[in-house]
A protein has these predicted regions:
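Amphipathic coiled-coil/heptad-repeat helices and related helical stalk/stem segments
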Residues: 9, 108-109
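N-terminal glycine-/serine-/threonine-rich phosphate-binding loop
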Residues: 1-54, 118
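Internal, conserved structured core segments that host functional sites
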Residues: 109-121
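Glycine-rich nucleotide/cofactor/substrate-binding loop typically near the N-terminus or early
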Residues: 28, 33-35, 39-98
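Active-site nucleophile and cofactor-binding loops and adjacent substrate-binding regions
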Residues: 101-108
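A short, small-residue-rich loop immediately preceding and capping a beta-strand
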Residues: 97-101, 119-121
Length: 121
């Protein structure tokens, strides 16, 4: 894991990484921009449940309040779902600005890969 003062790794995800368990990184744009509320939240939670049923740990990746998040809580997924398209769609170029401004960002595939790598996924 790359130590970064802006990175928060969910405790369940951190434990899975330490123990060598499989972790699946998921982008968050589908939650904020892909579907309307509440279907977006229901779908995101269902995908996480299916991943757990298959023996892996889900790590939905997002930026909340300028913090890079590797693994969201159900409450954070709900927050993202309710805010919807009011959340910035965050690509690589947006990371520094969102962190500096303390804003939220829904990760694209590229940004998801960057944050997942930082977290050791």
């Amino acid at each position: 894991m790359i130590m970064n003062k802006y990175l928060d790794v969910n405790p369940e995800v951190a434990a899975a990484i330490r123990e060598g368990k499989p972790v699946v990184a998921l982008e968050s744009t589908i939650i904020s921009h892909g579907m309307p509320y509440p279907q977006n939240v229901e779908t995101a939670l269902a995908v996480e449940r299916i991943i757990r049923e298959q023996g892996a740990v889900p790590a939905t990746i997002a930026i909340i309040g300028g913090r890079l998040k590797a693994g969201l809580t159900a409450e954070e997924i709900e927050y993202f779902g309710k805010k919807g398209q009011a959340i910035h769609k965050a690509s690589r170029r947006d990371l520094a600005v969102l962190c500096a401004r303390g804003e939220d960002g829904a990760t694209t595939v590229t940004t998801t890969m960057i944050i997942a790598h930082m977290a050791g996924i």
